[in-house]
Amino acid sequence: MNIKGSPWKGSLLLLLVSNLLLCQNVAPLPICPGGAARCQVTLRDLFDRAVVLSHYIHNLSSEMFSEFDKRYTHGRGFITRAINSCHTSSLPTPEDKEQAQQMNQKDFLSLIVSILRSWNEPLYHLVTEVRGMEEAPEAILSKAVEIEEQTKRLLEGMELIVSQVHPETKENEIYPVWTGLPSLQMADEESRLSAYYNLLHCLRRDSHKIDNYLKLLKCRIIHNNNC
């Protein structure tokens, strides 16, 4: 197929470069380099960049969870306590692809934005608390810092997408509130590590959901479900 001069060329090159950066664990390009107020990026490119960025965040979240699991939780059985205890569990998220495909497009976009907003505070405190740990593992801290920064960028990108797809939509500030800071500051090491494990487990879970949801939405909105 000759892509010279076709509208696919820019998107294809962007995805190729972004995939190379992901393989090298380098942050993807900004969703809108000029900032939201002066954004001239097309809807197709906004989705391309959001999908690449969400996948990058999920990869980092998975790596950070694995690092923490290996270093701190061997044989402690934290996983049994982490099930269904995420602060975003109250959100009505689709459980499989079929449910996701049946979800109203506007509600789907709003759901992704709500999940991203609900992670602003826990990610900020995660970075702050890990920095304060004795002998804070650099591999975990650096990933936490990067995830916090890139999640803000992804949220900005999603708000731009919503403004293009549904310009009549008013900003929705309703999202689940995280109340787990006291648990991260407990004096008892077992309880504190369990709280960290739960938070990282939930982050990995939610970043995976967003990654999948964005791919489905891109297929629906940009390619008219022809994927």
Curated annotation (Swiss-Prot):
One Gene Ontology CC term in the entry: extracellular space
Taxonomic superkingdom: Eukaryota
GO biological process: cell surface receptor signaling pathway; female pregnancy; lactation; mammary gland development; positive regulation of lactation; positive regulation of receptor signaling pathway via JAK-STAT; response to nutrient levels
Phosphoserine: residues carrying this PTM: 54, 62, 118
Carbohydrate attachment residues: 59
Disulfide linkage: 32-39, 86-202, 219-227
Subcellular localization, as worded in the UniProt entry: Secreted
Subunit structure, as described in the record: Interacts with PRLR.
Function: Prolactin acts primarily on the mammary gland by promoting lactation.
Name of protein: Prolactin
Species: Macaca mulatta (Rhesus macaque)
Gene name of the encoded protein: PRL
